[in-house]
C-alpha cells in the first residue's frame, strides 16, 4: 500500500492495518525459516510498510 492511501486512513484503521502487517510478518518469517518462502523480497516489503504505518501513527499524535 502506498503512502497516499495510508494517509487517508484514520488512526484506528492504521492500528488495525499494523496488526495485520505484524501477523503477515510473522507468517513470512516462519516461511523463511522452514525454507518455503519463494519471494524473499516480501520480508523487506512488510518491514517497510510497518515502518510507514508507525511513522504515520507517530505523526498524528
Curated annotation (Swiss-Prot):
GO molecular function, one term: structural constituent of ribosome
A GO cellular-component term linked to this record: cytosolic large ribosomal subunit
Origin: domain of life: Bacteria
A Pfam family matched in the record: Ribosomal_L29
SUPFAM superfamilies, sorted: Ribosomal protein L29 (L29p)
Record-linked CDD domains: Ribosomal_L29_HIP (cd00427)
Gene Ontology biological-process entries: translation
Disulfide bond sites: none
Keywords: Ribonucleoprotein, Ribosomal protein
Family: Belongs to the universal ribosomal protein uL29 family.
Protein's name according to its UniProt entry: Large ribosomal subunit protein uL29
Taxon lineage: Bacteria, Pseudomonadati, Pseudomonadota, Gammaproteobacteria, Lysobacterales
Amino acid at each position: 500500500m502506498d503512502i497516499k492511501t495510508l494517509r487517508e486512513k484514520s488512526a484506528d484503521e492504521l492500528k488495525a492495518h499494523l496488526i495485520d502487517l505484524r501477523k503477515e510478518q510473522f507468517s513470512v518469517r516462519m516461511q523463511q525459516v522452514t525454507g518455503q518462502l519463494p519471494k524473499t523480497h516480501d520480508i523487506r516489503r512488510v518491514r517497510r510498510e510497518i515502518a510507514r504505518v508507525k511513522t504515520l501513527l507517530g505523526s498524528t499524535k
